[in-house]
C-alpha cells in the first residue's frame, strides 16, 4: 500500500511539473501567461459576446461594441486563461442532455427534492404544442447549462392527473429555486409569465429570480452595518461592481453554496462618497472580496482565479467543502492508488486483472467502512470548536500560491481528460518497466504464461477446497481422528494420482525437537580425557573390550531370540524396532573404552516428548542416532533426524516416511511407553 501511495504522489508531482512545462511552452511561443490581463479593446465583437455568455450577462440591448466592452470591464478583469477557456467551450459546442420526466414521482425526486440547485422545466399540456420550439429550447438548454442549471421536459400526457392538480392547463415554463437561505430548505416553483418567447428574455427572467436571493447593498450605511456584523456565516464573498444585477455565475454559486457561504452584491452605481471602501481596503472596481475571520482575500490575484463559474466553484469548494466533497476526493485517490496494482503486479495478464479487481474491491470496502465512524463522529454535538479549527486550517492552506497552482492544474486536466489518462498510462508503463527490471536483477520467477498461472490458481483453489489446512496447535488431543470424515480425502490426496496440494511449511517450526541423550553419558571433553588416561593400557583394555563386546553381542542375540523377552522397541508400533539391536550409546562408549554398566548405556527415554515412538535409527538416512544429535518428531509419533525430516517435508512430501500420516495433522497419541528392560519376565 505504501508503495502505491508513493507512486501516486510521484504521479501528482509529474502532473505539476508537466503543467509548468506547458506554461513555459505557451510563454515561449506567444510571450504570454495564463494570468496575464487582456485588454478588451483588442478583442473582436464575437469574443466579447463569448465572454459575456460565460459570465452570464445579457447583451441583447447593446448593439455597439463599445457598450459590450464596457459591460465586460464592469463585470471583472479578463485574463488570458479565461479567454482561452471561453473560446474552447464555445468551439466544443457539445450537445447537453435534457431530462424527460415520466410522471409525478420522477418529477418530485429530481426537481422538488433537489434543494441545492435550479431546474428549468418545460411543461407541455395535453394536445398542445410546447411554449418554446425545439431549436430555441436546445439553445436555451445549452445557455443555462453553463451555470449548473438543469433542464427537463414534462409531458402532461404521461400524468394528466398531476397536471390538473398543479393547474398546468396550458404549456408553460417552470423554474424551481430554493426558497430559504438555509441548506436543504424548501423549494418554490416559479412560472414564466412573460410575453416574449425568446432565449434572452427567458434567461433574464431566470437570472433575475436567482439574483433576488442574494443580499444587495445600495448605500454606505448599509455596507458599514453589514461589514461589521458577525453572524453564523464564517465565509462571505462580496462583489463590488457598477452593475444592475450580479452575473449569472455569481447567482448560481449563491444557490449551490447555500448555508456555507454568504454572497453579497454591493451596487456602487450611484455612490458619490467611496471613502469608506478605501478604509476597508477596496480600491478597484469591480472587486471580488472574500471575508473570513482571518482577514480579507482578493479573488483574482492568483493563478487560475478567473471570473467564471468553474474557477470560483473550485476555489470555494477548497475553502468550505462539504462532507460529500471530501468523500468523492478520497474515493478518486483510493481508486487511482488501487489501479497502480495493474502495473506493479508482474506475470500473466489475467493475473494482473485478478489482482486489480481484488485490490479495487478491498480498497473501496475499507474506504466505505472507514467513513462510517467518521460520519458518526461528525454528527456528535459540541464539535463547533473542532469544525472551526479544521476550516481555519483549510482556509490558511488553500489561500496560498501553491494551492492556486493546484486548483489551476485541476481545472486544466479536468478539461483535458485524454491528457490526464495518457499521462497516467505512461506513468504506469514506466512503473511496470522498472519493476520488471528489478525482478529480473533479483532472479525472481514470474509466471508470464496465462495458462500456467491459471493452472497454479486452480491447484491452489482445489487444494484449499479439498485439502483444508488444519491448525497444528488447536486440535483436541482426545478426539478420534480415525473416525474423522475428512481422513479419506486427506489420504487420497497424497498418492500422486490425484491432486498436488499446495501446503505451507509454517507448521514445521511447531514440530517437537530435542537432543538424543544416553543414561550416564559424558561430555566430549570427559570422553577425551578418559581416552588419554587409558592410552598406555590400550592392549589389555582392547582385549577386555573385545571380550565384553562379544558377551554383550551374545546377550543381545539371546534376548532377541527368546520368545519370552520383550524387544527394545515395540515392533507393532515402530518400524524401526529391528534396528535397535545395538545401542549407539554402547558403541560410543566402546569407542572411548568406557566400562560403564549396561544400564548406563541405555537411551534416556524420559527426555523424549510424550507420544513419540522409541527407536534409535532414522529411516530417512538409515543412520543410528548419536549422542547429542538433534531429533524431530511427527504427529504420528515417528522420530527422525531433524535435518533429514526437514529436507523431506520441505521437498513437498507432507507425510510421514513410515506410515504416510499427514505431517501437519495431529493424531491420537499412543499409550505412554515404559523404559525397556533386559531382564526376561519370570
UniProtKB/Swiss-Prot annotation:
Catalytic activity: S-ubiquitinyl-[E2 ubiquitin-conjugating enzyme]-L-cysteine + [acceptor protein]-L-lysine = [E2 ubiquitin-conjugating enzyme]-L-cysteine + N(6)-ubiquitinyl-[acceptor protein]-L-lysine
Gene3D superfamilies to which the protein is assigned, alphabetical: Zinc/RING finger domain, C3HC4 (zinc finger)
Tissue expression as described in the entry: Expressed in different tissues including hippocampus, cerebral cortex, heart, kidney, spleen and lung. Expression is increased in hippocampus and frontal cortex after chronic treatment with antidepressants.
Alphabetical list of Pfam families matching this protein: zf-RING_2
RING-type ZnF: 618-660
Transmembrane stretches, start-end: 6-26, 326-346, 366-386, 411-431
GO terms, molecular function: ubiquitin-protein transferase activity; zinc ion binding
Function: Acts as an E2-dependent E3 ubiquitin-protein ligase, probably involved in the ER-associated protein degradation pathway.
Protein name (database record): E3 ubiquitin-protein ligase RNF103
Species whose genome carries this gene: Rattus norvegicus (Rat)
